[in-house]
């Protein structure tokens, strides 16, 4: 099955905007920390919510029910998904990463972007992804199912030894990149 089309009312465009913003934030965090520029941070940010796309594509009615429950109960989607699917979108993303033979460090970042303290192979990549996810939300790149998912990831900031004062410039860069993100999405959807 292709992930390109969705029959559900879930706003896939907002998800991709958020994913691109998360990728850009992850890349900037990695640069500020002088981490290797190997593309893994950008890739983890871009793909971190791929499990949502899979769940929405394969089980659109169930996914909409999960989104509805999350909104109504004011809980994060990743807490509601296991009630319906037996696992959350992060775990689904990890399963997809394994199926696609993605590097294990990247697969772990997909699986642990909400639970970076549980990462074993590369806690650093998982923490960068979690923090980038948060910064993308703060910069205004969210979606309707993000209820509660944008809590400040204190453990990630501490693990990365990043001063929260350094976040504002990343947030501002993301806000200024809105047109560029929309252009990237337009180019992809036109292809």
Per-region residue spans from a language model:
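Acidic/His-rich, divalent-metal-binding segments that scaffold phosphate/diphosphate chemistry
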Residues: 1-98, 104, 108-112, 119-132, ...
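A short hydrophobic/aromatic micro-motif that marks alpha-helical segments and, especially, helix-coil
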Residues: 63-64, 117-118, 148, 178
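Residue-level signal for threonine
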Residues: 103, 153
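A glycine-biased, small/acidic residue-tolerant capping/turn segment at secondary-structure junctions
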Residues: 142-151
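Terminal helices and disordered tails flanking the catalytic cores of nucleotide-processing hydrolases
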Residues: 154-191
């Amino acid at each position: 099955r292709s992930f390109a089309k969705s029959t559900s009312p879930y706003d896939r465009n907002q998800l991709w905007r958020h994913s691109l913003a998360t990728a850009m934030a992850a890349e900037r965090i990695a640069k500020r920390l002088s981490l290797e520029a190997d593309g893994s941070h950008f890739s983890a940010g871009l793909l971190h919510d791929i499990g949502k796309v899979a769940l929405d594509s394969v089980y659109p009615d169930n996914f909409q029910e999960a989104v509805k429950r999350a909104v109504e109960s004011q809980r994060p989607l990743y807490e509601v998904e296991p009630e319906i699917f037996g696992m959350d979108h992060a775990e689904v993303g990890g399963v997809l990463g394994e199926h696609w033979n993605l590097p294990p460090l990247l697969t772990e970042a997909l699986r642990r972007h909400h639970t970076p303290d549980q990462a074993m192979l590369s806690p650093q990549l998982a923490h960068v992804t979690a923090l980038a996810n948060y910064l993308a939300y703060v910069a205004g790149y969210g979606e309707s199912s993000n209820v509660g998912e944008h809590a400040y990831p204190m453990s990630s900031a501490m693990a990365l030894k990043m001063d929260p004062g350094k976040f504002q410039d990343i947030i501002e860069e993301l806000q200024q990149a809105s047109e560029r993100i929309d252009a990237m999405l337009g180019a992809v959807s036109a292809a």
